[in-house]
């Protein structure tokens, strides 16, 4: 049985990580077969999230919680869907790809909300838009294709770089 700790300096971030009624923590416990609980830091510097479980499981849960801490500290909302995505990526051994997602805020809305790829597939799509003149994308509805394409187009227009942004009047 291994015990790992994650220090969190802000209790609001801890609340975001654990989720309402600790649902995110319970989801992580079920997925990785660990026990997660929160204690006050011994030095009084915030909270200490403690993970207990087998070596590999505790490490995976620690990686997931570290990513969630980083996302929460950047102001991202940790939804049930995003927590499930983190669990799936960590379980598949894709920690490095997951870590790259938060590094790419490519646009900020008028209300100050950062626009960035939330999945590895979206990151590949944004990279393809940046590298290619034309990108044709297909996929299930609701996966962010149009949202990201419009955000990238507005970004190009704001940079006074409309030469790579073509809008065709279809009517």
Where are these regions (language model features)?
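Conserved glycine(s) of the Walker
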Residues: 144
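Hydrophobic positions on the alpha1 helix immediately C-terminal to the Walker A/P-loop
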Residues: 148, 152
